[in-house]
């Protein structure tokens, strides 16, 4: 084994050949050298592990194709496009919502050009970045005032820090949710300086539970919408309207965190009823917060709406500077919100809303079109079929609720297994993510555009050929 190490090429000789072949054109010399060193380290480990056992395995004709693949893979951007064939619309691991075309255009312009981010074009003086979206948000939701921060966790943090720091916030025990990434409402509350006062039981909380807990240290009544899980059976929760009435009786602000939140009524899709932001604001809840990049279909943002006196207080919190949104988020959010001025336009132009509301008959046609593309590209290397299935909204919204869809199934006819196909597709360019059901690799056209069908076929062909 030890003799095999001497047949490994030198770094400089490898770099020379890579340059001659044009493999590292445009790459910094240091990056190229690091990639080559990394590949040679892999070869050394393979010699030690008994994977490379013969001199011919280290010949240039054998090593160079592997090296080329290694270098090209290492030179690719780490953050890149992925084809989402999972059918999960707001896939939190694949970037959440897709932006509308107008929002993409607005972001591009904001990046490439100077703008009136904090400049009042009427007076020629300094302006507020929030002026670009506050009026829009209020018009759509019916709220008196609004503020946008960088995500909904920040919205919860700054709201609690402003309205309840050093005092108690009363919350139902059944609403102490974990919002993802191991971040929990009690932890956020602790960080804000507010003290948690739990009331009720896990499955049932009554209005009198809140009222009995009110004391001289109470600063806030809080309701957390459990959008990412369901408690079913013997349950009871207090509505935002009831809590708002109790708050007025005791001169206490009421805050509702809607989580994913939505501006669209999705009734008629077979999904359980979820309150819209407009409905919660209409219940006279003082402060409401929700996400911008989930069911709403915009960029990552935390949107806070409500009574002007409370929103103004939150705006003045020094923490607002630390959690404010940047110009790209602002541009994307304004463009997205403008689409919501007409609900039908939003359903048509906001990709997230369009995908959620797509009719099953249209999805069947899309699945058939995708299947035809795959058959043309793959030939006899795989059996392609279409069958009924389910999609999910994702993003912590409508948990355990299914949307009817049609899946395209791929079963390799050769030596590649379904599991190997799924794993191999993660390394194609672009990577393709799907799911395995009933011994078949499945693609859901709900989360794929027609322009991506050929890319899916080419990716699968790379693994099967």
UniProtKB/Swiss-Prot annotation:
Localization (cell): Cytoplasm
CC terms in the record's Gene Ontology section: cytoplasm
Enzyme Commission number, as recorded: 2.9.1.1
N6-(pyridoxal phosphate)lysine modifications at: 294
Cofactor: pyridoxal 5'-phosphate
Top EC class, one word: transferase
Keywords: Cytoplasm, Protein biosynthesis, Pyridoxal phosphate, Selenium, Transferase
MF annotations from Gene Ontology: L-seryl-tRNA(Sec) selenium transferase activity
Chief location bin: cytoplasm
Pathway: Aminoacyl-tRNA biosynthesis; selenocysteinyl-tRNA(Sec) biosynthesis; selenocysteinyl-tRNA(Sec) from L-seryl-tRNA(Sec) (bacterial route): step 1/1
Catalytic activity: L-seryl-tRNA(Sec) + selenophosphate + H(+) = L-selenocysteinyl-tRNA(Sec) + phosphate
Superkingdom in the source lineage: Bacteria
Gene3D superfamilies, A to Z: 3.90.1150.180, Type I PLP-dependent aspartate aminotransferase-like (Major domain) (3.40.640.10)
One example of a Gene Ontology biological process annotation: selenocysteine incorporation
Role according to the record: Converts seryl-tRNA(Sec) to selenocysteinyl-tRNA(Sec) required for selenoprotein biosynthesis.
Protein family: Belongs to the SelA family.
HAMAP family (UniProt xref): SelA (MF_00423)
PANTHER family, sorted: L-SERYL-TRNA(SEC) SELENIUM TRANSFERASE
Protein name stated in the entry: L-seryl-tRNA(Sec) selenium transferase
Taxonomic path: Bacteria, Pseudomonadati, Thermodesulfobacteriota, Desulfovibrionia, Desulfovibrionales
GN (gene name): selA
